Amino acid sequence: MNFCKAFSLLKILTLLVLAGILSACGGSDGFPPTVTGVKVQSAQYGKTATIYIGGKDLRTSVVVETNGSCTNPTFASSSTTDLLVLSCQARVVGDFPLVVKSAEGAVIYTSTLTVPKPQVTLITANGGFSLELNQALAPITVDNFLSYVAKGYYSNTLFHRVIPGFVAQGGGYTSGMVKKAGQLAPIVLESNNGLSNIRASVAMARTNVANSATSEFFINLVDNLSLDYKNSGSPGYAVFGSVVQGMALVDAMAQQPTGVINGFADVPLNEILISMVLQTQ
């Protein structure tokens, strides 16, 4: 064998050995992924959260687990080997685990993420006030209310029933006491949840039928313990949150003169219009 042939054979053998090493490691993706940090943007209950996972040699073949707390996970096309961008829908309130695993199932990173209690802000001509919603104790009611908020249903509805020393009720009528269309199906009554109709609490209005609440809600201007759950024969009204900012504005509603309009009593003569309701947390 001459020198040139021997050199060529050595070169081929070297390439084969290198190829074998790369193949054993998984090719260019052979280095194990590492995570150096996680950042969450827009972690609001019921909305899409964006999770940024930074590190090295990351691939969309890694597995991100949230114990069902953030559903429908999807990696963005903008993800790189140094930064994975994951979107998912936050379905719990409070702390939940985030675990990143390699494609082979090895845990490479763990963390705890937090979704705060949802808050919404109601805007009227006289200013705004904020509600904090208790998803843990009234999950069906909170999801229902946020569904109306998300589709903009409450825009241009009225606080149509205001009784000093009792309640301010809204969310079902437009100017001139016209019933607003587009309500969702009635929900199951969640009044036996440990929450009470105390001052500044917010509850769902309903008919005499227990499971009849749709869009209308009321704010308790005083402690109305008579509206609490007593038993199945006296189920009360489901509290699902409270006013956490701007209660003075709600109290001012009760100072407005009221009368009978289109057969409805206790209607503010100067309309109290809700221009919009936004989820702010």
Task: Please state what every model-predicted region is.
Residues 25-281:
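Cyclophilin-like peptidyl-prolyl cis-trans isomerases
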